[in-house]
Amino acid sequence: MAAYLLAVAILFCIQGWPSGTVQGQVMPFMEVYSRSACQTRETLVPILKEYPDEVSHLFKPSCVPVLRCGGCCSDESLTCTATGKHSVGREIMRVDPHKGTSKMEVMQFKEHTACECRPRSPGDVNNGKDKRNPEEGGPRARFPFV
């Protein structure tokens, strides 16, 4: 029995203690780092967000894939910002529920072509999520009702 426990202990030392995850599910640090960087990435954008005056119509699909800037910057004072844009067409079905008609059409959307980390505007510190309580100058309580 002691030999078995010794063998198990040596095996754990060689392979590492099991973490409860299946091998292969842990993404390596460098991949996490590169995939989280500020860059263009496919993003689903709701059509009504880009065309808010079109609320009288339904669209199929209701959102479209476009490249948009996203990701993390090395400093909280920076934000991932588009430095290049162009227009792309996406074929959409526009449904008019009042007339009971639908038609295929091409709608234009802004797509980001380049991104970089730039200083946030003064009113945009922490993307509106400042963790400091402005009255006390200290961190905001996580559970203000406790």
From Swiss-Prot:
Signal sequence range: 1-24
Location relative to the cell: Secreted
Gene3D superfamilies, per database record: Cystine-knot cytokines
GO CC entries: extracellular space; membrane
GO aspect biological process, one term: induction of positive chemotaxis
Organism domain of life: Eukaryota
SUPFAM superfamilies per UniProt: Cystine-knot cytokines
Biased composition (Basic and acidic residues): 118-139
Keywords from the UniProt entry: Disulfide bond, Growth factor, Pyrrolidone carboxylic acid, Secreted, Signal, Toxin
Disulfide bonds: 38-80, 69-115, 73-117
Subunit architecture: Homodimer; disulfide-linked. Interacts with VEGF receptor-1 (FLT1) with a high affinity, whereas it binds to VEGF receptor-2 (KDR) with a low affinity. Does not bind VEGF receptor-3 (FLT4).
Record-stated family: Belongs to the PDGF/VEGF growth factor family. Snake venom VEGF subfamily.
Name of the featured protein: Snake venom vascular endothelial growth factor toxin TfsvVEGF
Species in which this protein is naturally found: Protobothrops flavoviridis
